[in-house]
């Protein structure tokens, strides 16, 4: 298992949780973004900068993931592609995307895009709170624990 992070929009506090998990579990984490992201010195943490452009980081992640790799993203279409490649997709809020829920999440996303395109102001998601951070950390620990049991 390798952990990939769609780092362009990943909150700093979530990256910090991931950095600690990488050192604690010795699982490799790669952050992918189209701008520089500071990472701590660690043999388990790397950064890949891609060129600017629509979905360039997403496409790079999809190209490189393997079955059972974990991808941290709030991008619903990316999560869908990860699931199609037998990967695991987890949002920074701790929502585990699955075959059972990804299509409805895509439909909601598409509906909201349509609303925004027609001029309706839909607002953004609420700020990440302590419950979201705890939910993310708990799901991350469960996924890593399951992976370690299979090793």
UniProtKB/Swiss-Prot annotation:
Pfam family, one: DUF188
Domain of life: Bacteria
InterPro entries documented for this protein: UPF0178
Family: Belongs to the UPF0178 family.
Protein name: UPF0178 protein CPS_3584
Organism of origin: Colwellia psychrerythraea (strain 34H / ATCC BAA-681)
